[in-house]
């Protein structure tokens, strides 16, 4: 297993000042000033020109090209941007400190332009600079610089991608984030499942467990420094906490019977999970500081897959208390639960694996009915149900940090195995997420740059 200390977030990079530093000579735009507007539900991607990041010296050329490629791929995969082929460029940028000739970029129908530079500093660090231009108005929308160790150049590319996304859409991006998932290798009857973690675009895969025991349902803590998951080892399955920085793990409550479907509270102080007792399962929450446990449901049914609302006041969960698996919502401290899943076109449909959006506006779910497994979203009151994608076996949705994209896994059956896919909440731009092998049970981390002080 890789040295977990080498992947801790706090060592990734150093930003100038107390946060994101504006470049000298750049223009800082006030929140209310004009900027490009992109409706995330709009079907026409915005044409954007992304020039190669200039090298500060000949030895910086490869990393500059790498940063350019990562930014291009991020924006293209979002579905909101259409990067223009560099072969169409009329102007070749040679100095990012000089305003471009905007007519050259209008001619190739670019609405936005990204320029940048990568320079190795005397102390060995990399300095990354970028500019974002509104080609139509001729305004500079953003200009910032970052310093980082050379090995973390990809992270800089993701952060720049987020800055471009936010400046053009008015919403936070999601590129500077990770995904934890279950990596699957070997024949189906002897499948080895390991806990794995990667960047949201599939790069930098790291294996966190050796595969000697079966692992399921990994979930990030709010500060992205811990993962909770279920493991089938000696005896009953147990819920574990894994510390990414130290590589250490511990059992979350040594309960008799099986514990499963763990998830952190939004403040990271508690873990909610399902505990099997006889033929039924109920929801429990454990305070991670005091290790005290509170029972939230007490029914003869199977209550599982709990997920907190972003403000921590409510939970959604899956229960078969009405005879079929459906989604319910109740107060985080327990009490009466309200069913919110009611299929209008298939009264026999079942709902499972609910998860609350970080924005609080939707609950994503898996719906089974008519021989199909669908990934969908609905509002927390059950209204506005929308199926985004359907197939033989789609399951386990997880939201991006900005709540605009879902990742899930699809298993085609047969002798093969599952793969990860993403789709936006309007149901378009479905993409396969690259992984080394078969993969299931994805969970998206919060935006790493937003958790730097936690």
Curated annotation (Swiss-Prot):
PANTHER family: PROTEIN TOLB (PTHR36842:SF1), PROTEIN TOLB HOMOLOG (PTHR36842). It comes from the Bacteria. GO terms for biological process: cell division; protein import. Disulfide bonds: none annotated. The Tol-Pal system is composed of five core proteins: the inner membrane proteins TolA, TolQ and TolR, the periplasmic protein TolB and the outer membrane protein Pal. They form a network linking the inner and outer membranes and the peptidoglycan layer. The keyword Signal applies. This is Tol-Pal system protein TolB. Part of the Tol-Pal system, which plays a role in outer membrane invagination during cell division and is important for maintaining outer membrane integrity. GO terms for cellular component: periplasmic space. It is found in: Periplasm. Pfam families: PD40, TolB_N. It comes from Bradyrhizobium diazoefficiens (strain JCM 10833 / BCRC 13528 / IAM 13628 / NBRC 14792 / USDA 110). Gene3D superfamilies: TolB, C-terminal domain, TolB, N-terminal domain. Keywords: Cell cycle, Cell division, Periplasm, Signal. Belongs to the TolB family.
